[in-house]
UniProtKB/Swiss-Prot annotation:
Co-factor binding comment: Binds 1 Fe(2+) ion per subunit.
Top-level EC class as recorded in UniProt: transferase
SUPFAM superfamilies according to UniProt: Actin-like ATPase domain, Protein kinase-like (PK-like)
Entry protein name: Probable bifunctional tRNA threonylcarbamoyladenosine biosynthesis protein
Residues reported in the UniProt entry to bind ATP: L340, A341, K342, G343, A344, E345, A346, N347, I348, K361
Lineage, highest ranks first: Archaea, Methanobacteriati, Methanobacteriota, Methanomada group, Methanobacteria
Localization per record: Cytoplasm
Any single GO CC term annotated in Swiss-Prot or TrEMBL for this entry: cytoplasm
The family this protein is said to belong to: In the N-terminal section; belongs to the KAE1 / TsaD family. In the C-terminal section; belongs to the protein kinase superfamily. Tyr protein kinase family. BUD32 subfamily.
Active-site residues (renumbered): D451
One of the GO BP terms on file: tRNA threonylcarbamoyladenosine modification
Keywords linked to the UniProt accession: Acyltransferase, ATP-binding, Cytoplasm, Iron, Kinase, Metal-binding, Multifunctional enzyme, Nucleotide-binding, Serine/threonine-protein kinase, Transferase, tRNA processing
Cofactors that this protein relies on: Fe(2+)
Amino acid sequence: MLCLGIEGTAEKTGVGIVDEAGNVLSLRGKPLIPEKGGIHPREAAEHHAKWIPRLIAEACRDAGVELGEIGLISFSRGPGLGPALRTVATAARTLALSLDVPIVGVNHCIGHIEIGRLTTGASDPVSLYVSGGNTQVIAFNEGRYRVFGETLDIAVGNMLDQFARESGLGHPGGPVIEQLALKASEYIELPYSVKGMDISFSGLLTAALRKMEAGASLEDLAYSIQETAFSMLVEVTERALAYTEKNQVLLCGGVAVNRRLRDMLREMCQEHHVEFHMPPPEYCGDNGAMIAWLGQLVYKYRGPDALEDTTVVQRYRTDEVDVPWMRESEAGIELPPDILAKGAEANIYRGQWIGRPCIIKERISKGYRIPEIDQKLRSSRTRREARLINQAKGAGVHTPVLFDVDPDGGVMVMEEVRGTPFRDAVEDTELCSRIGEAIGRLHHAGIIHGDLTGSNIIIRGGDVVFIDFGLGRFSDEIEDMGVDLLVLKKSLESTHYALAGECFSRVLEGYGKIIDADIQSKIREIESRGRYTD
């Protein structure tokens, strides 16, 4: 059976034809290039209405098939621009009715992952999905693709486009910035904002525009924007990789064509001894083939949609969709024998300190980061982590005993905390409440952990011990407290979806015994700023 897929979530119209075996028979597309400014939803819809019929005819001709040989119609149901989505859905319904064939609406983001898996052979990767409208770190768990991290404000592609527009470089901004960066002479420091596995680009964009207004060269700014933003992207992917212990990384989405980002991610994968995958460039941007292939999968495992169920969903979350064709791989990361564990930031070794067993945490230099970013992060995070660990003890929170710290070398020597990671004990509701109280004590003391995941909370005997304060900081702002707790919530949802709701409710219950602020409202407010969250 042949499936014809129609893509049009934003400014690119795409049509593809794919058979049941995953052979791409044709791929046609037409982007909208605005004369000035960004993409207007109405103009995108008009563009799709004009080009969908033409591209369908061209795709059939390329595939050597008649339109009547198409057995299934698939279309992007969301997420995306409302007018654009509705135009695509109307075209898909009309075509399905006229051909008297079934129709399925599919998730655009999952389409990128599935065409990536199809074309690269990746089986169960951590996916970094980067485009104009989306920035997510995604991995499969418990029947769905879970979002382990994402932008808290604007997508990386949107950030690049906005800078290009404001600086007169035109649209799309990514390719122009990539070329300008090759001519740079120096790095200009810009905000580096990683919060657990989430990231923020708005501060980076604002700072870059101010530097431009102050006279900084566009070449240096282009280079600095890329190095800062892409280092953040690779770091959060690295964090998800360490957390999930998967052995593959897939780069997908329109920004994936950037050579510098590809090289940085490949370097990180080599450091972690895992596979790196990226689809061919023609499948990175929005395209009809990814929609057609996902349509084949959805139809095979779920069947067709009723016509009344083909409405569009502008804020269609990746983690709303069951993916019954996926299976979690049992393969994991194989580390060299001398490394006890490898986190996103550091290698962990066992050692001896004046005759006592200890853990050596070494923040190794990251080959994917330029020295100006790498050295600053390694030394500043080491200094800050040591202070946070010690001050947390003063707040009545258990943390490892520090034996020695070398900030310039990025090395910390501390006791080994042996116990059960919280991720393996989330069903214990009383424990969840006690963890909430401990987080409350940290926040009451002005300590933000920065990476509250189930791996960084250890249950040792009857004690709750917090480790890895590498992303921590000192703050008494309720915004930072909310983000800290949101990191924990998303970590729970990513790996224990069925238990996450009850567990996090108990965490907040315990937290409320220490902190009187309306933290739940703050968390909901922060969540509402994210991409495609209700």
